[in-house]
């Protein structure tokens, strides 16, 4: 029993380092119900919702600086004010926040009503604009007329979406896409709707035969360079020569929480090219639906593994690199917690991030992923009861937890330029070809190279040479000054060369050779990818300017070679060079070795990505 407690203690101690707990400051939002949270760079906007304390719908907006956890309320400009709403959707597009649908409240009649209008907030001008909706069949009271109006384009009436709340949503290119949701009677709406953000018009409406809503499902956009596309898109996808792909997304659905059912749907949107679309629009003036089509595939079987996520309420889905991140509220009689699961494309497994002691207590709900820093952000309150807030659908913003995903091997791979086989072969030829200078290693060995390649592929090399020239100039002037004051005033020309054909790099021959191979070829071959050499290259990157991309590439390679034999070397190097995510992952591996080296099987209740 004492050994088990020791292992849990070690595991929790590493969680302390992979998670940062912060207290929100300044103008923190009150507890809210049904608000929207939108990421914007290093900030997050919180808009609308219902005040959990007095049940009033609000149209306030708050923004938090995620570097300082400082909140402030946004002051609007202009006369246009947004409509108070909750359980609406919020998306970011071109420095604008797009809010659709949700539920409104009439203070006079004390009635709720569903919406299908759009409010747009311009982040730069701090002004609002409004796009009215239209009365639809599922709006049964007159309150909606005050908001939605009736002045709409007769030709596009049939394309207006049904009013709804709790729907799914995303932005692909310049299109806002709305999926499903529920009406005022809580019936599911089986629709897909597309709004053209450029023209300000609804352009598509179609049946979507799924019961989707934020309580048990969510969606995420797939980047066009993601390996998930190769995994899910069929090889024999038939695409008309007159159409092009707008983008793709995943739907994750889970339901029947006693005996959980899961479904993953791949959806790709195609649009007719402009010339062809205009022809069809002329022939079918009333039916813009002809301009779009969806490819829908059930890819659930591709995401099956020995361990599977439990049923999650209000799931959130994100993609970071080759990882699909699923988070949400897990409720059973024995455990109530906010949990994170990751589908690793490399391992082809669902794995739970080990977060014992951090999100296992308190009330946590709204979340987002910071791609650039590989961090998962969760808003909540560490002292409240999750079950109580879940029953109220209440969100809190008093505390913020930052989880270093890279410490679990979940991160976005560095964006390296695409290196073709031909360009790599050319680089190798040049590496063994002509040269006009040399790299001098710590062993006093010389490696010939071409200065033009260094200038072109390593922009900071120019600064290094300029500083060398400046030093030579200063040394020359110092020597001249010793010969007498009459020589000091002579108009000597500036020195434009270092006078040397060698650049000293205080690293081994193997490390310098690997560095030059990267400069010439844009990649490293297997012989250079030993842990010791990669650690030396990481230190080299910190010692010279302009090697940030190479630094990220080496960190990625070190993640790939990390094992029990080199973990301490990698930990020390990562700590020395400031590679925090790699350092944390190595620390977690060291802690696991200290536990006795026993691996947790994939079917364990708490597997992790280092197994």
UniProtKB/Swiss-Prot annotation:
Keywords: Kelch repeat, Phosphoprotein, Repeat
Residue stretches spanning the membrane: none
Superkingdom, taxonomy of origin: Eukaryota
InterPro entries: Kelch-typ_b-propeller, SKP1/BTB/POZ_sf
An example Gene Ontology CC term for this record: endoplasmic reticulum
Kelch repeat start-end pairs: 43-91, 96-149, 175-224
GO biological process, one term: cell redox homeostasis
GO molecular-function terms, A-Z: peroxidase activity
This protein's record includes keyword Repeat: yes
Keyword Repeat tagged: yes
Pfam families in UniProt: Kelch_KLHDC2_KLHL20_DRC7
Residues with Phosphoserine modification: 604
Known role: Essential for mating and for recognition of the mating pheromone, and for the determination of cell shape. Implicated in activation of the ras1 protein.
Name used for this protein in its record: Protein ral2
Gene: ral2
């Amino acid at each position: 029993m004492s050994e088990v407690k020791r292992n849990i203690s070690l595991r929790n101690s590493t969680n302390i380092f992979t998670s940062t707990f912060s207290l929100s400051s300044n103008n923190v939002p009150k507890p809210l119900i049904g608000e929207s949270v939108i990421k914007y760079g290093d900030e997050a906007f919180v808009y609308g919702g219902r005040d959990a304390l007095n049940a009033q719908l609000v149209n306030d907006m708050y923004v938090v600086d995620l570097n300082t956890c400082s909140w402030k309320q946004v002051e609007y400009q202009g006369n246009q004010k947004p409509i108070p709403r909750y359980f609406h959707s919020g998306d970011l597009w071109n420095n604008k926040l797009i809010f659709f649908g949700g539920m409104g409240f009439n203070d006079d009649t004390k009635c709720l009503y569903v919406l299908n209008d759009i409010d747009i907030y311009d982040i730069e001008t701090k002004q609002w604009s409004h796009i009215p909706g239209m009365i639809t069949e599922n709006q049964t009271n007159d309150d909606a007329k005050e908001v939605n109006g009736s002045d709409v384009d007769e030709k596009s009436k049939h394309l207006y979406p049904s009013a709804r709340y709790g729907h799914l949503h995303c932005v692909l290119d310049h299109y806002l896409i709305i999926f499903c949701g529920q009406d005022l009677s809580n019936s599911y709406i089986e629709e897909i709707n597309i709004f053209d953000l450029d023209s300000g018009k609804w352009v598509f409406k179609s049946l979507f035969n799924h019961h989707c809503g934020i309580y048990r499902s969510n969606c995420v956009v797939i980047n066009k360079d993601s390996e998930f596309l190769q995994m899910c898109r069929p090889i024999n996808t038939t695409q008309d020569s007159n159409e092009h792909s707008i983008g793709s997304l995943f739907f994750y659905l889970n339901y029947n929480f006693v005996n959980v059912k899961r479904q993953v749907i791949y959806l790709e949107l195609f649009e007719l090219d402009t010339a062809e679309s205009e022809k069809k629009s002329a022939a079918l003036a009333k039916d813009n639906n002809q301009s779009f089509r969806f490819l829908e595939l059930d890819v659930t079987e591709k995401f099956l593994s020995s361990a599977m996520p439990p049923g999650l309420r209000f799931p959130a889905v994100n993609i970071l690199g080759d990882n699909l991140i699923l988070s949400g509220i897990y409720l059973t009689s024995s455990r109530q917690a906010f949990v994170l699961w990751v589908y690793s494309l490399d391992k082809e497994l669902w794995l739970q991030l080990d977060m014992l002691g951090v999100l296992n207590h308190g009330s946590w709900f709204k979340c987002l992923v910071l791609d650039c820093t590989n961090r998962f952000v969760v808003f909540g309150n560490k002292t409240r009861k999750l079950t109580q807030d879940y029953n109220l659908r209440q969100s809190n913003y008093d505390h913020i937890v930052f989880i270093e995903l890279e410490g679990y091997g979940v991160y976005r791979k560095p964006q390296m330029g695409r290196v073709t086989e031909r360009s790599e072969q050319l680089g190798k030829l040049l590496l063994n070809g002509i040269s006009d200078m040399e790299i001098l290693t710590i062993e006093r060995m010389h490696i010939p190279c071409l200065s033009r390649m260094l200038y072109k592929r390593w922009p900071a090399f120019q600064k290094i040479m300029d500083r060398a020239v400046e030093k030579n100039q200063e040394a020359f002037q110092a020597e001249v000054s010793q010969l007498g004051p009459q020589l000091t005033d002579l108009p000597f020309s500036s020195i434009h060369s270092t006078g040397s054909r060698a650049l000293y790099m205080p690293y081994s021959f193997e490390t310098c050779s690997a560095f030059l191979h990267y400069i010439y070829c844009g990649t490293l071959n297997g012989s250079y990818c030993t842990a010791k050499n990669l650690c030396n290259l990481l230190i080299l990157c910190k010692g010279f300017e302009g090697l940030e991309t190479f630094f990220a590439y080496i960190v990625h390679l070190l993640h790939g070679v990390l094992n029990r034999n080199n973990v301490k070397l990698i930990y020390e190097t990562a700590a020395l060079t400031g590679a925090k995510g790699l350092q944390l992952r190595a620390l977690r591996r060291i802690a696991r070795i200290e536990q006795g080296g026993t691996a947790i099987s994939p079917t364990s209740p708490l597997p992790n990505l280092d197994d």
